[in-house]
Amino acid sequence: MAEVHRPRGVPRHASLLVSLCFGILFVAKTLGQIQGSAGQTDTKPFTASVALREGYDSNPLTQSYQSTQDIQSSTYTSIQPSLGYNYLGMQADMALRYDFSGTYYPSINQQYDIQYAQTFTGRYTYAIDPRTSFTLGNNFVYTEQPLVAQFVQAGISPTFNTSTINNLATVQADYRVTDRLSMITRWNNTLVYLGGSSANNNYMNNGAFQQFRLDFTPETVGTFSFDYQIYDYDLDNTYRDNQQVAFSVGADHTFLPTLFFSGRAGLQLNDNFGLADNDFIVGNGGLGSGEQEIGAFPFASITGTWNYEQRSFLSAGFSTQIQQSNQANASDSEAYTLNLNWDHYFTDKFSVIQSFFINVATFTPQLSQEQASAARLSYQGSGTQTTVSYQCKFAYEFLPYLSAELGWSYTSYGSYFDVNNSNNPSYNRNQVYLGVRGTY
């Protein structure tokens, strides 16, 4: 993908952002006068919002604290407009949304001092009858100098690429076989294209998902799921092509109308067939065999949600998974993830939103140091990678369409191994901001 250069001169960007802001508000006001043709009641046919923020970032380039260079900090200005359309009909409903996020770091003063992301989301659902419905969905994300939040949740250190394209398309069918038995069938396709030095990580993912849901009681639903995914890399110079099959059982239980729990446990099988092309792999047949035994690894997760007030809720989730490496010379990993979310309204106008995420992954090498040396491979030994993210935002609504925001976010990523410790990506980052948000 061709490299995109920003225009020279900050005033040009400033005028563009201001024009975009006023343009969105004007369009929202105009479209808001159009009545929905399907008899919408509570849902507005058109929605619009825009947030303007001024803040400080302690480490916008996610520089490692192990680096010999001074970590560069910067103030920043960001704009986040959003447009949405909702249609509700007798048999069909549709939702479209466009989100933009742009941030300017004046202290960086380089080509990448402006970072932005655009997201297009669409969903269309058609109900053939009360028992059967089909849903088409698509989520398209384009970023220029990718935002850190998109990488942290995946447990990896962000890399500054020229551009990133990520598209997820889904087709889903929901069908109730009997009064107690229902099914969900879904196909997914993911395309990932990365620019710059990460272009060799481009890949396509196709998958199929089937779930059976049995209503044991009005409060308890049992599930059995089958999930198949295949990954195909454009430039597979590291032999990463693989396929995964997962089986799981679980249950969803409603203790109270406001208290809900869900749990899953299963087994995942990995077939790293891309290794068959690697002449240096130490497999079951010895050096150069290009073989790796299909691994079966367990996983489990549990989540809970408590809606204790009309607009306030508390949710938590925990999961654990053992993942086989897609290279025989690398390490298997065992990961633990914890998520916490809390939205609370102190009054009708004053609220707080908090989220906490932590992922701890431990790695165990498949080869000894002697085997790795014989295969001319690097060896790092055992290691641990830890990702922590916390976000907090206070909001006060002055008017029904205007509110003030005060927020803080913290991100930490650490990577440590016994041998040849490559912890250069390890970093800490703090962001604080003050802003306003207009909504329609």
Residue ranges and their predicted role:
Residues G9-P11, L17, L52, I358:
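Alpha-helical and His/Cys-centered functional microenvironments
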Residues M1-R12:
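N-terminal secretory signal peptides that target proteins for export/translocation
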Residues L31-Y440:
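Gram-negative and organellar
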Residues S15-L25, K29:
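Bacterial N-terminal signal peptides
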